[in-house]
Amino acid sequence: KEMPVTIGVFINPGTIPAVRPGGKSRSNRSFEYDSLGSRYATFLIDEFLPAVTKDLNLVDDPQARGIVGISSSGICAFTAAWERPDYFSKVISYIGSFTNIRGGHVYPALIRKTESKPIRVFLQDGENDLDNLHGHWPLANRQMAAALKFAKYDYRFEMGDGGHSGQHGG
């Protein structure tokens, strides 16, 4: 089966330049991507998508729309679909941060206890992914896969041997 014409829209998280020479740039990346709730999905639906698609003739069908992310944007992609499956029905999360950075560790329990949503999920992680004060990424992704299986989601989980890097999903 051939893949239909596809348009990818990529968002770089904004940063605030350092105010002093040698200082660090600041970012709201973790607040925007790792937080649970509908805020980021609302931004995409109400502000971002209308701006980038105004001159494009796109199908208005959530079954034809997906969202992808890696690391913090991996959990962000899942959160957008979880909160708004009427807009995002397919999710790909590479080395997703389903750990306790800003509450993502609760997703396996939520998935098990909440009526299934009309989303398809692909998760991918590596055995040598992060293990730090926020949690253990391979274990967190395994817990996500187990919860999706328990709740009878259409999902796929692939565990490789890589670490926390952009080589995943490539």
What would you call each of these model-derived segments?
Residues 1-170:
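Non-catalytic cap/lid and distal C-terminal segments of serine-dependent acyl enzymes
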